[in-house]
Amino acid sequence: MKRFSILLSMSPDSGTVPARALDTLEAALSKGYAVFVFLYEDGVLFARKDRDTPQGEIDLVSRFSSLSTHPNCDSVACITASERRGLRNSSLLASVRFGGLGEWTESLSSS
């Protein structure tokens, strides 16, 4: 199976770039790729299950949550970035786990 790695470092509220990143993630999964998603810096906010989206805005967290449950998707939130933003196990999406930058670099070598 072909592998694809993507790093999300922007918050879900950062304009159209995060939506396009999710479009890319969805396309890779639909084409049968095994996808590794690394959430870094403000990107860890995609993993917050209790995040509220303002009325009238697209809920990218729910969209990411749905994509991250795909059997070929491995989603990892940077533990250090998560701690800096108050993200703990109790507020983490069930389909996302904590990990370190080493996992990102390993994923790049196999993608």
Please provide the spans of the model-predicted regions.
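A structural signal for isolated positions on well-ordered beta-strands in alpha/beta enzyme cores
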Residues: 5, 36-38, 76
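Short, glycine-rich nucleotide/cofactor-binding loops
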Residues: 4-19, 47-52
